[in-house]
């Protein structure tokens, strides 16, 4: 579960290393984001010469959460860290590579480009 002020690792090659969630999109009272949800975040740490720099406000989709999530078949999915992939305004990923596994929920939420770039879908 991601909420305001949560820090997430960036799982793509845009140059950002860490982001801080400033808003969960999807309704005025929405408090938490899970796998496949879009957030607004600010870049807290970035590598020099990357596509984004520290202080940039970006949209991102959550691809891994440390809090377990129950799936419709009764199984649970949990990761070691919270991670996100930065998005362009049209919903496509900004980077050309995705690092680490991503949740199957991204396929249900129509993030097919991220699913195809990911090395593993769990």
From Swiss-Prot:
SMART domains per UniProt: Ribosomal_L14
Keywords: Ribonucleoprotein, Ribosomal protein, RNA-binding, rRNA-binding
Gene3D superfamilies tied to this protein: Ribosomal protein L14
GO molecular function term, any single one: structural constituent of ribosome
Single Gene Ontology BP annotation: translation
One GO CC term, this protein: cytosolic large ribosomal subunit
Pfam families given in the database record: Ribosomal_L14
InterPro entries: Ribosomal_uL14, Ribosomal_uL14_bac-type, Ribosomal_uL14_CS, Ribosomal_uL14_sf
Family (UniProt): Belongs to the universal ribosomal protein uL14 family.
Protein purpose: Binds to 23S rRNA. Forms part of two intersubunit bridges in the 70S ribosome.
Family matches, as PANTHER family: 50S/60S RIBOSOMAL PROTEIN L14/L23 (PTHR11761), LARGE RIBOSOMAL SUBUNIT PROTEIN UL14M (PTHR11761:SF3)
Assembly mode: Part of the 50S ribosomal subunit. Forms a cluster with proteins L3 and L19. In the 70S ribosome, L14 and L19 interact and together make contacts with the 16S rRNA in bridges B5 and B8.
Protein's UniProt name: Large ribosomal subunit protein uL14
Gene expressing this chain: rplN
């Amino acid at each position: 579960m991601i909420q305001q002020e949560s820090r997430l690792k960036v799982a793509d090659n845009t140059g950002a290393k860490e982001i801080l969630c400033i808003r969960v999109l999807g309704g005025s009272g929405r408090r938490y984001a899970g796998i496949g949800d879009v957030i607004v975040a600010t870049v807290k740490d970035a590598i020099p010469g990357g596509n984004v720099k520290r202080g940039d406000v970006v949209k991102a989709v959550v691809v891994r959460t440390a809090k377990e999530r129950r799936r419709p078949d009764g199984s649970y999915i949990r990761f070691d860290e919270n991670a996100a992939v930065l998005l362009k305004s049209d919903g496509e990923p900004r980077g050309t590579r995705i690092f680490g596994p991503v949740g199957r929920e991204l396929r249900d939420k129509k993030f097919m480009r991220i699913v195809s770039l990911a090395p593993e879908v769990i």
